[in-house]
Amino acid sequence: AKMASDQGLIGFSCTNSEAIMVPTYARQAMLGSNPIAWTVPADPVDFFFDCSTTVVTRGKLEMYNKMGKATPDGWAVNKDGVPSTDAAEVLGNISRHEGGGILPLGGATEVLGGHKGYGNGMIAELFSSILSQGGTSNKCMVGGKSNICHGFMAINPEFFGDPAEIKKHFSQFLQELREAPKAQGQDRIYTHGEKEHESVAKVKAEGIPVLN
């Protein structure tokens, strides 16, 4: 996606992955973390939104498992579709295809919008495995072989108007977001991509930190 915005285009990319997401009201993992990324040219930094469509990724569960800690509530369910904070149990069930998995972004039910994370996961599936007629998340790892699919798109803003004016209009709105009234105790409102831009600049200036 960033390759597109570097050329003044709106970029989109997504991928499916081995099934870890339990659809809303299901108890079997059927979708991957299925991340989606959008990038849009803007000043002073490009808008860069990149997220999984699950509450967390598999790596977060693996980290909690290594530390021997219970995961926060609302991350996963066991093979019966019951909430679980046991990372080892959930990871084992996913690996053995015994049921359970990680919840969609928004959680287990429709109350806090779990169906929306599920739907966004389906959008990633559509633009990766369905349009390419490849392996869907529940079938992309067969016999130890990967058949993961990807989707990419670049949109030329010239189709809609003057690219410079569109960029200026979007940049102005992003600045208005940054300057919106802040919640109590907060001193800054970020737009997507700012933290990453600042992190990259810091690493270039100071080097990559190494933990002992």
Residue ranges and their predicted role:
Residues 126, 131, 139-212:
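Catalytic-core signal marking the mid-to-C-terminal active-site face
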Residues 6-10, 16, 43, 54, ...:
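Generic secondary-structure signature for well-ordered alpha-helical cores
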Residues 69-139:
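Secondary-shell segments that build the walls of catalytic and ion/ligand-binding clefts
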Residues 1-31:
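Long, hydrophobic, well-ordered secondary-structure blocks that form the structural core
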Residues 33, 100, 115-122, 164-172:
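Conserved active-site and cofactor/substrate-binding residues in soluble primary-metabolism enzymes
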Residues 21-95:
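Phosphate/diphosphate-binding glycine-rich loops and adjacent basic-rich segments that engage nucleotide
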Residues 12-15, 39-41, 49-52, 154, ...:
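Short beta-strand segments
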